[in-house]
Curated annotation (Swiss-Prot):
Paired cysteines (S-S): C3-C21, C14-C38, C42-C53, C54-C59
Principal subcellular localization: secreted
Name of one Pfam family that matches: Toxin_cobra-type
Name of this chain's protein: Cytotoxin SP13b
Tissues and organs where the protein is expressed, per its UniProt entry: Expressed by the venom gland.
SUPFAM superfamilies listed in its UniProt record: Snake toxin-like
GO terms for biological process, alphabetical: killing of cells of another organism
Species name: Naja atra (Chinese cobra)
GO cellular component: extracellular region; membrane; other organism cell membrane
Keyword 4Fe-4S: no
Length: 60
């Protein structure tokens, strides 16, 4: 997961209060993200799901 610190037009910015980017993967297939977006607190990994978070609000 690449975190973007600059402001290129291609990257969206997270809404106020949700300034972490994240990707969610299934543990059975860690190469294809199931969901991505913005969140306020990085979720904990579970047996089925792995989360990868960034501490920036530039989503890619």
């Amino acid at each position: 997961l690449k975190c973007n610190k600059l402001k290129p037009l291609a990257y969206k910015t997270c809404p106020a209060g949700k300034n972490l980017c994240y990707k969610m993967f299934m543990m059975s297939n860690k190469t294809v993200p199931v969901k991505r977006g913005c969140i306020d607190v990085c979720p904990k990994n579970s047996l089925l799901v792995k989360y990868v978070c960034c501490n920036t609000d530039r989503c890619n």
